[in-house]
Amino acid sequence: VAGKGGVGKTSLSATIVKTLVQTYPDKKILAIDADPAVGLSTALGIEVKHTIDDIRKDVIENVEQGNNKQAIDILNEARFRIYDALVETDGFTFIAVGRPESAGCYCKINSYLKDIISILSEEFDYVVIDGEAGIEQINRRVMEKVTHLILITDTSKKGRDVCATIKN
């Protein structure tokens, strides 16, 4: 789910997750909060202990501290830790991107998120992604694995322009 900010993307994403859980109780469903505003966890009543950004920061810290591990070991550990960030609930699994502390571009976290979506999407029947407002995740092909994209907006020119840009 993508589009303009403040128009209900998170509410729609939560509704889709709940509907999938009720309609397909035997299917594996993953909800991804890809919005740094971190609202999907609240909408779904999830308590998040570890986020994707927490894992990314830990990996960077290990490298910066001169950890003697080989690069492949660090990558394998990062991949394994993704599963630590998953929150298992009744009927679905949840993971959150978190709120990167630095201002500006979320390039690094979005690149990591893209890899995580690629890894996890193979393990679930349905993956619902609550995307951040605007076009950055679309432009960076974070949602490259997406088969269906719902664009949500209001009637403002800015909102229509965001959706038109994403659509094109």
For the regions a language model picked out, list residue spans one by one.
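N-terminal phosphate/diphosphate-binding loop that engages ATP/GTP or pyrophosphate donors
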Residues: 21-88
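Hydrophobic positions on the alpha1 helix immediately C-terminal to the Walker A/P-loop
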Residues: 12, 16
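Conserved catalytic-core segment of NTP-binding enzymes
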Residues: 22, 108-168
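Conserved lysine of the Walker
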Residues: 9
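Short, glycine/acidic-enriched loop or turn micro-motifs at the edges of active sites
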Residues: 36-38, 99, 133, 157
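P-loop (Walker A) phosphate-binding loop of NTP-binding proteins
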Residues: 3-4
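Residues at the starts of beta-strands that form the adenosine-phosphate
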Residues: 28, 91, 148
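Cytosolic-facing regulatory segments adjacent to core modules
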Residues: 75-84, 88, 93-129
